[in-house]
């Protein structure tokens, strides 16, 4: 049977959430090279940096990119496109078009996203939250037509909603056999790790403030903030340091510590952060997540998680029966802040979670108290369950199954395989 030509279009070489998503899609396709002839069209992703490490996967990607350029220049076409980007950038590029997106961190998607989704053959999302928001967003409207007899404009009520087949496929775990703890000079024995970009959605300013307010007089507790504004360069670090100093300057007598971590880190180094014995828990008071990859990495590494109890992270912070396996911070759903509005993406009339300050402080304190009394050992067992539930093999298969391209009658392959003999 002829392999299907697949074009993966996405920010596969960038250090970004969508970059990680594109690499997962690529690895899923690569797990079935018996089915797919893979081509790659790399995209930039905002101001985020590009991957710096060179390994066998990077060399393979570079070869595929060169192959793609040559193939397109010679008029090659594709059976399938997998487009890893926000929906308003999806296009009709192949016979079968699959949109793959993180979806949305709020309660509503834009009308353009629904229209673009309905133009796809299938849509794959990273979490059930994103899938549910797509499926539950509806817009009432009218179709206007001119009556040929009266020449009057007639308006017929209609509803814009998602009609395309949609699937939620989570990320897989990553396993490092020789993982050594990341070396960090931490003066405090108990520390939260917060991996978050400086921006409205991650709620980082309040996270830092509420941490300091709760542990103001506790010299044993620290907060490690791994962050950036856009890139991992020196100018960006200086900007982050300035913002951080501005926040902590409001608390001149604090005894707790706040540490800034900045710069390029490999996936392995990020995992090594969580196995440092002084990292007690992961902390995220986010307004919303498509999935929440840093929290996922912490959870399957065996680190307790303190997080907002809403959006994409619930796919892995809750078990398959819905039981919460984390320190769940209460929240209220309210309209997104004005500074977060992004035309065509984050809508002014959409909502996301606003963690309650007292609940956040209470859960942080509860987590530290549990760690001091040895009550967090259960998270190693939970991590083992996550490793099984989200194994690479299972997630790659789920992604390929969601594409649903194995079945069906391939006319071209059938013609190629025909045995035709001349009869005299």
Where are each of the predicted segments found?
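Extended catalytic core of nucleotide-activated donor transferases of GT-like folds
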Residues: 7-9, 48-133
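N-terminal pre-catalytic "stem/leader" segment of glycosyltransferase-like enzymes
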Residues: 1-77, 222, 397, 424
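A charged, aromatic-enriched C-terminal amphipathic alpha-helix characteristic of glycosyltransferases
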Residues: 351-359, 369-401
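C-terminal alpha-helical cap of glycosyltransferases
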Residues: 366, 370, 392-424
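Donor nucleotide-sugar binding/catalytic pocket of nucleotide-sugar-dependent glycosyltransferases
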Residues: 122-178
């Amino acid at each position: 049977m002829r392999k299907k030509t697949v074009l993966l279009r996405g920010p596969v070489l960038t250090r970004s959430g969508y970059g990680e998503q594109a690499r997962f899609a690529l690895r899923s396709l690569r797990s079935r090279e018996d089915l797919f002839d893979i081509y790659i069209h790399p995209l930039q992703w905002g101001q985020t940096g590009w991957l710096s490490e060179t390994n066998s996967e990077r060399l393979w990607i570079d070869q595929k990119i060169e192959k793609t350029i040559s193939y397109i220049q010679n008029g090659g076409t594709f059976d399938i496109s997998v487009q890893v980007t926000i929906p308003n950038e999806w296009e009709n590029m192949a016979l079968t078009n699959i949109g793959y997106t993180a979806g949305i961190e709020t309660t509503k998607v834009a009308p353009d996203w629904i229209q673009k989704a309905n133009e796809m053959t299938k849509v794959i999302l990273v979490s059930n939250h994103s899938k549910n928001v797509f499926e539950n967003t509806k817009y009432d409207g009218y179709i206007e037509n001119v009556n040929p007899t009266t020449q009057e404009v007639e308006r017929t009520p209609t509803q814009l909603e998602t009609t395309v087949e949609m699937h939620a496929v989570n990320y897989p775990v990553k396993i490092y056999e020789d993982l050594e703890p990341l070396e960090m000079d931490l003066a405090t024995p108990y520390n939260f790790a917060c991996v978050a970009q400086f921006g409205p959605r991650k709620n980082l300013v309040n996270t830092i403030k509420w941490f300091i307010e709760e542990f103001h007089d506790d010299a044993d507790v620290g907060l490690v903030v791994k962050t950036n504004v856009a890139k991992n360069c020196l100018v960006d670090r200086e900007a982050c340091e300035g913002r951080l100093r501005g926040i902590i300057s409001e608390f001149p007598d604090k005894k707790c510590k706040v540490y800034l971590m900045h710069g390029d880190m490999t996936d392995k180094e990020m995992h090594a952060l969580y196995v440092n014995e002084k990292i007690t828990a992961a902390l995220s008071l986010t307004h919303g997540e498509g999935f929440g990859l840093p929290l996922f990495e912490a959870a399957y590494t065996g680190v307790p998680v303190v997080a907002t109890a809403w959006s994409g992270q619930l796919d892995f912070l809750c078990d398959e029966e819905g039981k919460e396996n984390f320190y769940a911070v209460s929240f209220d759903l309210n309209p997104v802040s004005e500074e977060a509005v992004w035309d065509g993406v984050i809508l002014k009339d959409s909502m996301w979670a606003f963690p309650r300050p007292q609940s956040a402080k209470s859960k942080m304190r509860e987590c530290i108290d549990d760690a001091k009394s040895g009550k967090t050992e259960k998270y190693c067992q939970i991590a083992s369950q996550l490793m099984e539930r989200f194994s690479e093999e299972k997630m790659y298969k789920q992604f390929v199954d969601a594409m649903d391209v194995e079945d069906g009658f391939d006319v071209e392959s059938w013609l190629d395989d025909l045995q035709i003999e001349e009869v005299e």
